[in-house]
């Protein structure tokens, strides 16, 4: 990781997850997110130390492990303070709630116990709310951008807007088809809100630096509205259960839920049989080798 200058005292560490860096007058560094796991925390710390900087705080955009997994390492090794939005702080402090939510309240299967979903518990020193925030002598503006999570938050300083996962890049939209979201309503409201900002630079978590996001905001909005329109049209032609709607949406957008080979399904009579292999395998096992079978009528 190498420090990339954006403008004034604002930088970022480019990677699979871009880490924002705001530098104070005394060499203190405010980080926007911390990457995935201890390895990311270690790489961030080394990159900062190479520039004579010390991480004073991590400002998390949200709780997902690829954005907050380095928190605990930076707290333990550098004494960094952690700032987080309210709902996300619950999962940072007790990550099990995140995996429980993903698995409908049940004990999560083995595949969910990976750093992206099952990070180390992180302390949270300050709950972030929308408005001006001064951290160790450095002032930033916290902007509520819910949708990806319930309290997802972006940060602005010196005309640079750190967006976290509030926007998906063109490549992400192509890969995911339908991006993950906590609330479609919140996502649409956030996309509308983003049109009101005129910053010098915008940094997406998984994309390169941009000078303008107008077209990307519209592309994100269009994808959400296309999905909603398809669902409304589908349900206007016949009543359907949620599982039928899910299948129809996946077929319409060419999505596959079993592309990693960890979860597969087939229809037998009136039952949907889910075969979940949580032995840590490669995904190449046949159905009869799976350890767990759940039946859904």
Report each predicted region and the residues it spans.
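Conserved beta-strand hairpin/beta-sheet module of binuclear metal-dependent hydrolase folds
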Residues: 1-51, 154-166
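Conserved beta-strand segments of alpha/beta enzyme cores
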Residues: 2, 11, 81, 126, ...
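Divalent metal-coordination and catalytic microenvironments
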Residues: 9, 22, 33, 48, ...
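Conserved HGGG/HGGXW glycine-rich cap/lid loop of the alpha/beta-hydrolase fold
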Residues: 11, 67, 144
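Residue-level marker for buried hydrophobic side chains located in beta-strands
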Residues: 30, 59, 82, 160-163, ...
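Metallo-beta-lactamase
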Residues: 36-37, 132, 139-146, 150-228
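Active-site HxH/HxHxD metal-binding segment of metal-dependent hydrolases
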Residues: 42, 46-132
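C-terminal regulatory/interaction regions
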Residues: 230-297
